[in-house]
């Protein structure tokens, strides 16, 4: 057993308790009532970096929530690894569906249940504890920098300003991110890419006020009905997206790439059982793994209007709203897709309503070459601790800052995520397996070792 593994074994209970303390802070970036919690969480992250051995741990204020920067420069001749993560979390709603308090971390059957357990507190904190292991055992072989932001869940609106203003500070040789998932602990994998994102809100307005549905119903267009029809028109009978030009820039995956994806373990019955669905859905001609990894999508994230309170209220609403996200694949542009979606909804609106639409945020897709020494270092690290080679896969989610880092810092990005698709990210009862948390802490130092050797 090497020195850092011995240190982990001796301190793993403390590592876990420190993570639970961090999870108790309700750092919800989307809600202004949590602004004080965001500040408290940033301070906690900075302190954890200092305690782990960082020479610098600074909180940078932004127009929104703070960014925490940390670094340890061991030797200027060593390669430098920039670790990115985020301490903000999604809103916990609906609270009534949680089995325990979202900010009262609870351990059940070896799993941590709490908002942010996997996304991303549990995952970025692995790097903090790996840093502590390496500093305390004199095992540092790279310089390490940290950028832990507080606005990832709302589109990172202030990160670009920070990155562009601090290019010298952020100079590195690679960016390492743990904010993705594996197939399973028995079948380790590495995300070699993430999809881009276009997030849009649609507002449909009919009459100038809510109306009595008995007096006006049948004579005035109902915005909810109109919006529902417009949304339904976005897919055809093959579940193909109908928006003109949506697929124009999509580069079809090669037969060999699709064959490689088909080798990844996937149990369709288990997939359906886990989700409680009778059957799957999706674009005709593609497998479930392809639909969630290499194909673009359009999903309705929310739709509302009229009266949704307790009891009954017979109104014909003035307005209806929907929030829509599109996941994008390499060569698609979030700006282009956003414009196409906005124009489409306006073009198909009947003349008895008006439609307004606007963009919330977006990001570009990203791919890591599997023949790069950055990827190979991660693959070797995972093979060392898991005892088998990881499978390269495409992630279905989005990390909008990837293209920013690549463009501004000129660095390749490696995704080393230890979550699982079943971890209920963005949903009630988010979880993170303790064994995954520990395995990540064990694996990360090997990445630094192998990356330094390759450099």
Task: Mark where each language-model region is.
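Active-site metal-coordination/substrate-binding segment of hydrolases
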Residues: 78-145, 439
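Acidic, glycine-rich active-site loops and adjacent beta-strand->loop/helix elements
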Residues: 87-89, 147-155, 178-182, 206-208, ...
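Acidic/histidine-rich catalytic neighborhood of metal-dependent amide-processing enzymes
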Residues: 120-193, 455
